[in-house]
UniProtKB/Swiss-Prot annotation:
Residues 1222-1240, 1275-1288 have a biased composition (Low complexity). ATP binds at N543, R572, R576. Changing S1235A: Impaired phosphorylation by GSK3B in response to stress, leading to increased mTORC2 activity. Its main location: membrane. This is Rapamycin-insensitive companion of mTOR. Component of the mechanistic target of rapamycin complex 2 (mTORC2), which transduces signals from growth factors to pathways involved in proliferation, cytoskeletal organization, lipogenesis and anabolic output. In response to growth factors, mTORC2 phosphorylates and activates AGC protein kinase family members, including AKT (AKT1, AKT2 and AKT3), PKC (PRKCA, PRKCB and PRKCE) and SGK1. In contrast to mTORC1, mTORC2 is nutrient-insensitive. Within the mTORC2 complex, RICTOR probably acts as a molecular adapter. RICTOR is responsible for the FKBP12-rapamycin-insensitivity of mTORC2. Residues 521-570 are annotated as: Ribosome-binding domain. Belongs to the RICTOR family. Residues 1022-1041, 1103-1134, 1204-1252, 1275-1298 are annotated as: Disordered. It is found in: Cell membrane; Endoplasmic reticulum membrane; Lysosome membrane. The keyword Zinc-finger does not apply. Residues 1206-1221 have a biased composition (Polar residues). GO terms for biological process: actin cytoskeleton organization; cellular response to nutrient levels; cytoskeleton organization; embryo development ending in birth or egg hatching; lipid biosynthetic process; negative regulation of apoptotic process; positive regulation of actin filament polymerization; positive regulation of cell growth.
Length: 1708
């Protein structure tokens, strides 16, 4: 009703407005023949004189009435549509804006289909529509109607949309704000609408630039989002992506942040610059955030190369505080994090983002406890995927990959305090988020914070920076403590509920616990008396001065109560407290809620009631006194008028509301319940339920009582749920969610029943809330069983009710219940037919609500609501899917198999049709269905049989419709819900999160399935020296060394490999993939259960059959044996389990050596080792490092060795290896560490040099992970003309004590050095060989990438980048030894360095000793959260380059124009296209009027005769308002002279007749301050034009040339067109305008020329003019009569009515 009433009132207003404007009431007789009515209307509209404008207005309004009455039919109307349009368009030329508005309205009603629209456009009415939009003279009514007509044209057929109107809209969009045009937003909205329907015409005219410009102009998030989403929609699909310039247009929104000199408008005054900059920041922030909320935006801003995300993060490293502050706000918004207050105090900032901080919505008058609990208590879903997590994980991974963490460290250490504080909190939030939602391959390097640790520990950097870093680490520790503590309830009511729920569970668990207070000290009584005295209660009556801490202690004292202690002092103590708390005393009750000790006083009050309860009979009298007083207060409150009771009792503002907590405390105890019954408290509360306007009292009642026991408390709750007001019923329903989340005892027995009752509430909001709570409750199987037992009716609740019912199918009991009723078969059919598609809408709507300003329409309202209010970290839990529920058990799986559903879904995925949106939606529906099926092990087997998972992975990486990639990411997350799913994805280089939500601090499970005895293989770290070890936080007490061994195996395909040491000389062409994390294999690397076995086998192998000496000058290095060249072997690494070397001085190896074991070592150095068969022993000293380590330079004494051990493992593994891995974020120099994540070094087998350590030194801060797959034929790299180097495993253990490294701007990659002092090491030449190997790998990965692109990881400290020159054949070191040493000296000793994963196969998911959890002890039955990402996140950001679209595709009615303006031109705004450019080119070639008139007589004649010139270069019959009608009507108008369109009209008029001039007397030039007739100097306005700088008048001697001659008109036309085209340039605009005004003044009849106006309109439709210029041009022609067009209309109406013929061509 409201909507109807509103519509009627608006209509009345509209009518009244027209009457106010003077419209004459023209009667319309609908009983007459429609053709007669129409003829009368058209005659009145077309008549030039004799009909007042207001009468015309009446007739035009009658025209719309007539159309609405009889419909669209040429037969009924008696006129062709062309005839009607020829007459109606005259209304658009009327001088009265009301008539023009009515004409536009009439056209809008007339255009019903494409055929009519084609006719309107053929008659060039679009020129006149554009004219209405351009002109602004208090004519908003007219312009509004014009825009409504434009929208109708888009709706009818956007592909026909004319460029003339597009240019007009774009001009308003570009310049409207400066011109204070009120239609600017409407025009931009229409441009967006058009861009979606016909992107080509918008892109061709530069409309996309207009949209993006307005993004930076608009600070309203709803509008800003709509604008940017238009561009993102075009980027989403390959067919429309061509219209957006790659890497240029979308990146415009970043400009305010990335361009420090950005000025949005050159006209901004200096004084307004700061304000303008703030506005641009805000608008840009909104645009960036909206872009990151869409898949098209994410993929385009994150794609590898020079991406937008790199620009943003790079700017963080530049010390501009204003930009940093703004960017931090952007990042907080992108990750949906609350923004801390601006402060220099970290604690203050931290408290401002504490989830438990007070919020206004938690007040009693608002959402109270229900709102607080929804924020603080976690959702019951433990493993149901939250799609927001998937989205955030992807974004976070992309940002981390591009160096965000290092950027934040730079901001923390180099910014003002308030910025540093914000950056620290953001860093903490992101690390916490990464720990929770990132797969381990994406997060293993996050927790080290090496750069920050380095800065805090190093004395080589400025003190201020070091102190900042140290402070930041302390702050992060406090932040972690806050996260670990979790959100604490703010209100005592919620705290009371949670504590009671915990207490009941604990009591149940510890029912038979032994009393702890058996051994009470003898002096308890004495101590009690001392405390009584010190509490001050007995000393004085200043209640608030009492020691309330001591009072609480006394009341909680074990075994102290009035029953045990008869002491009078204790009774006095109790009486004083009782008096204080009684409502009648008005002491406690009248204190304000925000009083400093308010919470403490209430807590003590609750303890006091418990104390009295425990005192039994002795305390009963006091307790009864208190309770009766509270009842009296309650009755008094409820008896008053509501406003008085609240005002007088101060329920909203005073502690009186906490009396309900006292009642709640009593309701938790059986004795307390009896007391409440005895004092009629329950009866009083029941009476409250039926009273009106007692909402606050009822809220307090519901929130305070304990419902764990069956009794009157539940009766009261039940009554409030059914009998109270709507607001109270809704609150009570919401409170059931609080009880559910607080895990109140036996909720499934009684809570579910109450919720089912609420489903039938007449208020839809309440039933919907109950349904939502039931959905959450069913996450718990006990609740689901209880619900199925009740068999509720859910069909009346729409789609949500249906989805809840589908949950029944997930357990056999529910399946059989529904199957018996034939429900399952019906649903299968429905889902196949329509619900699979509906499911896509449901999910995308939820995601839109969570991510954008979109709000779901309420109660069937079609109006799309938007909200500027920012949602706090919303959740989008995956809706229930029929197939996903069926696959939870074997019966359901069998049913899906029998129905052949999966095969069809797989077919849709394998052969998608991406050209139609319906097909794209069908593909999404199939993906979601398959994902839900794959979310259980049963269903996953079905997907495996179809082998469809690789197809989904392919779509995720390569699909050209970018939103499909997003859907695939979500769907692959569903497949990763089970361990089996994770393992399958792992084989395809996708890593998944392997924990559920109940693990708040997830520990990485051990993936090593083959590990027989996990505990025995937990390695530990080698102690470097006492100083470094003691400085390590939480270091292991017992440190033992470990060793790394290379395992070679001639049997291909027998086990997984991790090849670090590669023979570079072998011929092979492995395939490389850039990875952001180690690649995980299905089966991990085999450890040996017994460390003794390993020790023996390794020691048995220490013979040296193939030693090869190499001097430091040997250019080729130690060549490997010919055997190693010819045989294809697989090299694997193994981390030896911990072996304690400290118990013996040395090892004595067993002398027998197995034949299959080889040791291949190449030595370099000046120490000679005999090439004998003896096996050197490894002594303890060989592995110990002295404290003077690093003082001598023995770089030549390095050695390389290869220990070769045979190992047999499982035979079904893929062959994978890691050739080069620099992917620790830590500075990787570590002690000889061996951890689950660590490959350790090859043992140095020399016995002579006791200071020799291991040769493994690779340092890096961020990751370039490279893995390659070995083919069975070969496993070595080929590298011509290169050293044969046995390479070191990057990041493996090290031997240097280190200081922290101070980094330069983190955006610059710095080397961490490969040199060290007196332990065996790679030479610098080896380092270059190593680097070259890396470069070649990168080139094979991305042949098209430049050196910097290929090598520069987003890391800030990448190994081997700019500091080493990367040239294939000429290695030049830019590092001096001293710089090597300096770099090494900085390295940090962060604990996590030792725990950073290296080995891809075995140790992917490992962290540290504390992370070692066997999969056996891990919660196996619990599903994971359902989140997976590719190991290399860039895999899903690759987009095929589509060239920018060509401008040759012009709408059909512009063919002639397209031919005319075919070339190129300069100086135009982008987006105008070739048409625009060439018109300049041609028009500049014309001779100016001055040149023609200055030429001699014969030249002028020749010029005119040779060109057959009309003065109009682009004129055709099709693009002229006048000539097109002649062509259509097929007759000539009466006034031939009016149209000088063809040369024949004046061809026979001799030149001398009007220019009586001899050859010897040329035209005289009369100087004036203007040049030419126009008064415009072409020398100034157009570079290169050949015009006179003098002024001319058309004179013969002193006689003016007659201006009514054809020749004169030609010249004037040329001059007008030349000046008009010059106006499209912003140079000398004023000069050109002056020239046109001069012509207007001297030759006004020049502009009364329809063909000239059509030509000008044609130029306006094909060239870009600024809005002021368009307005100026339109106003030149504004007072023109256009008589010939009236004559055409009269000719139409003069012809007798003829039978209309349907135009079939137009229809086609």
């Amino acid at each position: 009703m409201a909507a109807i009433g509103r519509g009627r009132s608006l209509k009345n207003l509209r009518v009244r407005g027209r009457n106010d404007s003077g419209e004459e009431n023209v009667p319309l007789d609908l009983t007459r023949e429609p053709s007669d009515n129409l003829r009368e209307i058209l005659q009145n509209v077309a008549r030039l004189q004799g009909v007042s404008n207001m009468r015309k207005l009446g007739h035009l309004n009658n025209f719309t009435k007539l159309l609405c009455d009889i419909g669209h039919s040429e037969e009924k109307l008696g006129f062709h549509y062309e005839d009607i349009i020829i007459c109606l368009r005259l209304a658009l030329l009327n001088e009265a804006k009301e008539v023009r508005a009515a004409g536009l309205r009439a056209l809008r009603y007339l255009i019903q289909d494409s055929s009519i629209l084609q006719k309107v456009l053929k008659l060039k009415v679009d020129y006149l529509i554009a004219r209405c939009i351009d002109i602004q003279q208090s004519n908003e009514v007219e312009r509004t109607q014009a825009l409504r007509l434009v929208r109708k044209m888009i709706t009818v057929n956007a592909s026909l949309f004319p460029s003339s109107v597009t240019n007009s809209l774009i001009a308003v969009g570009n310049d409207g704000l400066q011109e204070r045009d009120r239609m600017v937003r409407a025009c931009i909205a229409i441009i967006c609408e058009l861009a979606l329907q016909n992107p080509e015409v918008v892109a061709l005219r530069g409309g996309l630039n207009t949209i993006l410009k307005n993004v930076i102009d608009c600070q309203l998030s709803r509008i800003n989002e709509a604008l940017i989403t238009t561009i993102l929609h075009l980027l989403n699909h390959p067919k429309t992506r061509q219209y957006v310039r790659a890497d240029v247009e979308l990146e415009r929104i970043l400009a305010p942040y990335t361009d420090f000199h950005y000025r949005h408008s050159p006209d901004t005054a200096e004084g307004q610059l700061k304000e303008d900059r703030e506005a641009r920041f805000l608008a840009s922030k909104m645009g960036i955030i909206a872009t990151f909320r869409s898949w098209a935006g994410i993929i385009n801003l994150c794609k590898p190369g020079n991406s937008g995300i790199q620009s943003l993060i790079g700017v963080l490293c530049i010390p501009n505080m204003e930009i940093r502050r703004g960017l931090l706000e952007v990042l907080y918004d992108i990750f949906r994090l609350p923004l801390p207050v601006v402060t220099e105090e970290f604690i203050e900032a931290l408290l401002s983002v504490d989830p438990g901080r007070f919020q206004d919505s938690w007040r009693l008058s608002d959402g109270f406890v229900a709102a607080e609990a929804k924020t603080i208590l976690p959702h019951r879903a433990r493993s149901r995927p939250d799609l927001m997590d998937n989205y955030l994980a992807l974004i976070l991974s992309a940002f981390i990959r591009n160096g965000l963490l290092e950027g934040l460290v730079e901001v923390i250490t180099n910014s003002d305090d308030h910025i540093s504080v914000r950056a620290t909190i953001l860093l903490g939030e992101l690390l916490h988020m990464a720990n929770t939602i990132l797969p381990h391959s994406h997060s293993h390097h996050l927790h080290c914070l090496p750069t920050l640790m380095n800065m805090a520990a190093s004395f080589d950097i400025p003190k201020e920076k070091r102190l900042r870093a140290s402070a930041a680490l302390n702050c992060l520790k406090r932040f972690h403590e806050m996260k670990k503590r979790g959100p604490k309830p703010y209100s005592l009511h919620l705290d009371h509920i949670i504590q009671k729920a915990i207490a009941t569970h604990q009591k149940r668990d510890q029912y038979l616990r032994v009393q702890k207070d058996i051994f009470i000290l003898k002096d308890t009584e004495e101590a009690l008396l001392i405390n009584l005295r010190d509490s001050q209660v007995l000393q004085h009556k200043e209640n608030l001065e009492w020691n309330w801490n001591l009072i609480g202690t006394i009341l909680k004292w074990p075994n102290v109560n009035l029953r045990n202690y008869k002491d009078e002092q204790l009774h006095r103590f109790v009486r004083r407290l009782l008096y204080f708390y009684k409502p009648s005393s008005k002491l406690y009750a009248n204190l304000d809620l925000d009083f400093a000790k308010a919470k403490q006083l209430t807590v003590v009050g609750c303890q006091f009631t418990e104390f009295l309860l425990e005192s039994e009979e002795d305390g009963q009298g006091y307790l009864e006194d208190l309770v009766k007083d509270i009842v009296q207060w309650l009755n008094a409150s409820s008896g008053m008028k509501p406003e008085r009771s609240l005002q007088n009792n101060g329920l909203l503002t005073t502690l009186s509301q906490h009396y309900f907590l006292f009642i709640g405390t009593l309701s938790c105890h059986p004795h307390g319940v009896k007391m409440l019954e005895k004092c009629s408290v329950f009866q009083c509360l029941l009476n409250l339920c039926s009273l009106k306007n007692q909402d606050h009292l009822l809220k307090l009642t519901v929130s305070s009582l304990d419902y764990s026991r069956d009794g009157l408390a539940r009766v009261i709750l039940s009554k409030i749920l059914t009998a109270a007001t709507d607001a109270c019923r809704l609150y009570a329903t919401k409170h059931l969610r609080v009880l559910l989340r607080a895990n109140v005892e036996f909720f499934n027995n009684w809570g579910i029943e109450l919720l089912v009752t609420q489903l039938h509430d007449k208020n839809k909001t309440i039933s919907s809330e109950a349904l939502d709570i039931l959905d959450e409750a069913c996450e718990d199987k006990a609740n689901l069983h209880a619900l199925i037992q009740m068999k509720p009716a859910l069909s009346h609740l729409g789609d949500k009710g249906l989805l809840l019912l589908l949950r029944f199918l997930s357990i056999p009991k529910g399946f059989s219940y529904l199957n018996e009723r034939g429900y399952v078969a019906k649903q299968l059919e429905k889902w196949h037919r329509e619900y699979n598609s509906k499911y896509v809408d449901l999910i995308e709507e939820q995601l839109n609500e969570a991510l954008t300003t979109y709000r779901k329409p309420v109660d069937g309202d079609n109006y799309v609501r938007r909200s500027n209010q920012r949602l706090q970290r919303p959740h989008v839990y995956l809706p229930i899917h029929l197939y996903g529920q069926l696959v939870h058990h074997k019966t359901g799986c069998h049913l899906l198999e029998v129905q052949n559903i999966i095969t069809e879904l797989c077919r849709n995925v394998r052969t998608p049709d991406l050209d139609k949106w319906e097909e794209i939606k069908k593909l999404k529906a199939s993906l979601w269905a398959l994902g839900n099926i794959g979310s259980s092990n049963w269903g996953l087997n079905l997907l495996q049989e179809e082998n469809v998972i690789p197809d989904i992975l392919k779509l995720a990486k390569q699909c050209e419709v970018l939103s499909i990639r997003g859907t695939c990411v979500y769907v692959l997350g569903l497949i990763a819900k089970t361990k089996q799913g994770c393992d399958i994805l792992k084989c395809h280089n996708w890593d998944a999160v392997r924990h559920s939500r109940k693990h708040l601090w997830p520990v990485v499970p051990d993936d090593v399935e083959q590990l027989c005895n996990e505990l025995s293989s937990i390695p530990s770290t080698l102690s470097l020296n006492s100083e470094s070890t003691s400085s390590r936080h939480n270091s292991e007490s017992e440190s033992v060394p470990s060793s790394m061994f290379i395992l070679e195996d001639d049997r291909f395909g027998s086990s997984s490999t991790s090849t670090f040491f590669l023979d570079i000389n072998e011929d092979t062409e492995p395939t490389f993939y850039d990875r952001s994390g180690p690649i995980k294999d299905k089966n991990s690397f085999p450890f040996f259960a017994s460390s003794k076995l390993v020790k023996n086998r390794i020691l048995n192998s220490l013979t040296l059959p193939n030693k090869k000496h190499r001097s430091s000058s040997d250019p080729k290095g130690g060549k490997l044996s010919s055997e190693s060249k010819t045989s294809n072997r697989r090299i694997r690494t193994l981390t030896e389990p911990s072996v304690d070397f400290n118990h013996s001085d040395d090892f004595t190896p067993i002398s027998t050596v197995q034949k299959t074991l080889q040791l291949e070592t190449s030595f370099m150095g000046n120490k000679h080792i005999e090439d004998t068969g003896s096996t050197p022993s490894i002594g303890e000293n060989d592995l110990k490092f002295t404290k003077n380590f690093g003082t001598e330079n023995h770089r030549e004494n390095t050695s390389r060795e290869r220990l070769v051990v045979e190992s047999s493992t499982s035979s079904h593994m893929k062959i994978r290896s890691q050739s080069f891995n620099t992917d620790t974020t830590t500075s990787g120099i570590s002690s000889m560490s061996s951890s689950p994540s660590r490959e350790t070094v090859g043992v140095d087998a020399t016995t002579m040099d006791t200071d020799c350590g291991s040769m493994s030194t690779v340092v890096s801060t961020k990751t370039i992970k490279t893995s390659h797959y070995l083919t069975p034929q070969s496993n070595h790299l080929s590298l011509s003309k290169s050293n044969s180097v046995s390479l070191v495993p990057p990041g493996s253990s090290h031997t240097l004590p280190r200081r922290a490294q101070s980094l330069k701007a983190p955006s610059i990659a710095t080397i961490k050095s490969l040199a060290d002092c007196n332990f065996s090491y790679t030479s610098s030449r080896d380092a270059f060989g190593y680097a070259t190997l890396k470069r070649l790998q990168q080139q094979r990965m991305h042949p098209s990438l430049s050196h910097s692109e290929a090598l520069a990881s987003p890391a800030k400290d990448v190994l081997f980048t700019d500091t080493i020159t990367m040239k294939a054949n000429s290695f030049e070191s830019r590092l001096t030894p001293s710089r090597f040493m300096k770099a090494l000296s900085y390295a940090s000793l962060d604990k996590e360095d030792l725990l950073s994963p290296i080995n891809q196969n075995t140790l992917q998911r490992s962290s540290s000793v504390r992370s070692m959890v066997s999969s056996a002890t891990y919660g196996g039955s619990d599903d994971y959260i359902g989140l997976a990402l590719p190991v290399d996140i860039n895999d899903i950001f690759q987009v095929k380059d589509i060239p920018y679209f060509q401008t040759k595709n012009i709408p059909p009615h512009d063919d002639r124009g397209a031919r005319a303006f075919a070339h190129d031109a300069g100086g135009l705004p982008s987006g105008t296209g070739g048409l625009v450019k060439n018109s300049f080119h041609l028009l500049r070639q014309q001779m100016s009027l001055t040149e023609i008139m200055n030429s001699i007589h014969s030249d002028a004649s020749l010029f005119l005769e040779s060109t057959e010139d009309t003065g109009l270069q682009e004129h055709t019959d099709d693009n002229c308002l006048y000539c097109v009608c002649i062509e259509i009507l097929g007759f000539q108008p009466s006034n031939q002279l009016s149209a000088i369109c063809s040369h024949s009209d004046f061809q026979d008029i001799p030149y001398s007749d009007w220019c009586e001039q001899t050859i010897h007397n040329p035209l005289e030039v009369v100087p004036s301050k203007f040049s030419g007739i126009s008064g415009c100097s072409d020398g100034v306005s157009q570079e290169g034009s050949a015009s006179s700088t003098k002024s001319t008048e058309l004179l013969l001697g002193v006689k003016t040339i007659p201006d009514d001659t054809p020749m004169c008109r030609i010249l004037l036309r040329k001059e007008v067109l030349r000046l008009v085209i010059n106006l499209s340039s912003s140079v000398s605009t004023k000069c050109h305008e002056t020239g046109l005004l001069t012509i207007k003044e001297k030759y006004p009849q020049t502009f009364d020329d329809i063909c000239l106006y059509s030509e000008v309109s044609h130029l306006l439709s094909h060239c870009t003019f600024r809005l002021p210029c368009r307005r100026f041009i339109q106003e030149l022609f504004q007072d023109v009569q256009f008589l010939q067009m009236h004559e055409e209309a009269e000719a139409v109406l003069a012809t007798p009515p003829k039978q209309p013929i349907v135009d079939t061509s137009a229809e086609s």
